[in-house]
């Protein structure tokens, strides 16, 4: 297997940085959309393991994330239209994979925040992928999101979109961690594996406060997700842990699974791992989870084995 850097220039002048893990005889592609306040390189071990099993993996960093992101832009998508920009970035990554490796089925895995980016992508570009895998996602809780939007908009009105609010961080990540008191670190909610938690805590590209603007974009993006508008023949697979605070300890993930199924999607699956916290891919039983992801990547839908020549939406200026 070989590894190559990925560098793509977007129409609005942004540079997408990532990495490709290319086995000698790939049978499928997996594009990974990472979560908030982390980066694509955290999936390197998974990517290498999947590569050893003939899955071509592409990881990349969202805007405002990753080691190449300037400090002044960390945790911030864009001053305008941030959500659509990150969705279009993902579309560009997928199209690059399609063009470089024609004929291979493309699976999209989105984790946490990245799972919602992936859902927005599927809503707009669903015919471009063969399967959607959602890791550590949650239901679209509209009343809660609308209340959060009021608070975030108030802070933005006073402090500006680029302000990094510790209050929002405490109300989200801090709340998640309180479920695991007494806490050893501020990130115990991520995994039962203390080594994985310590690696996250020590990583300067992880755990930072995001801008109020990113939170505005994120909330608006989540509110725009409507599974009833997705392509019905797109397979959707949800995986989470029963102790994932983001997924409401399994409750929210189950509800989202039910919503997607009732929306008419023909193939929807849910896998809950007992006792697992937010990052199932970094959990104590991660090899079991990796094997499950490998199994999903090897499932090919003949109706989606080739990319369809659909026009892509124009990227925002």
Model-inferred region functions:
Residues 27, 34-38, 112, 242-243:
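Active-site glycine-rich loops that stabilize anionic/oxyanionic intermediates
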Residues 1-22:
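N-terminal cap/lid segment of alpha/beta-hydrolase-fold proteins
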Residues 263-317:
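Catalytic active-site module of serine/aspartate enzymes centered on a nucleophile-bearing elbow/loop
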Residues 118-205:
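Alpha/beta-hydrolase-fold enzymes
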Residues 78-98:
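Alpha/beta-hydrolase active-site loop
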Residues 45-73:
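Conserved alpha/beta-hydrolase
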Residues 101-112:
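Alpha/beta-hydrolase fold nucleophile elbow
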Residues 238-240:
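Short beta-strand/loop motif that positions the catalytic acidic residue
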């Amino acid at each position: 297997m070989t590894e190559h850097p990925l560098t793509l220039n977007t129409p609005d002048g942004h540079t997408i940085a990532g990495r490709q893990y290319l086995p000698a005889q790939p049978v499928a592609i997996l594009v990974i959309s990472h979560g908030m306040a982390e980066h694509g390189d955290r999936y390197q071990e998974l990517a290498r393991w999947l590569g050893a099993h003939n899955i071509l993996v592409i990881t990349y960093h969202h805007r405002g994330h990753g080691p190449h992101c300037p400090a002044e832009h960390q945790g911030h998508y864009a001053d305008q239209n941030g959500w659509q920009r990150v969705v279009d970035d993902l579309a560009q990554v997928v199209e690059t994979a399609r063009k470089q490796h024609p004929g291979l089925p493309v699976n999209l895995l989105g984790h946490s925040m990245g799972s919602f980016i992936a859902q927005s992508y599927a809503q707009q570009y669903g015919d471009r992928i063969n399967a959607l895998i959602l890791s550590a996602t949650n239901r679209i809780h509209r009343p809660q999101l609308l209340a959060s939007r009021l608070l975030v908009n108030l802070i933005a009105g006073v402090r500006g979109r680029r302000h990094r609010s510790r209050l929002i961080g405490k109300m989200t990540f801090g709340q998640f961690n309180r479920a695991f008191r007494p806490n050893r670190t501020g990130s115990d909610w991520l995994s039962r594996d203390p080594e994985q938690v310590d690696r996250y805590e020590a990583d300067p590209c992880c755990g930072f406060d995001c801008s109020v603007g990113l939170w505005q974009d994120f909330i608006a993006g989540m509110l725009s997700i409507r599974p009833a508008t997705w392509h019905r023949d797109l397979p959707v697979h949800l995986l989470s842990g029963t102790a994932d605070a983001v997924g409401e300890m399994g409750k929210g993930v189950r509800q989202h699974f039910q919503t997607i199924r009732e929306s008419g999607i023909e193939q929807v699956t849910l896998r809950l791992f007992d006792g697992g916290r937010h990052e199932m891919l970094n959990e104590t039983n991660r090899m079991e989870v990796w094997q499950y992801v490998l199994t999903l990547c090897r499932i090919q839908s003949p109706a989606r084995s080739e990319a369809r020549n659909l026009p892509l939406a124009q990227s925002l200026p």
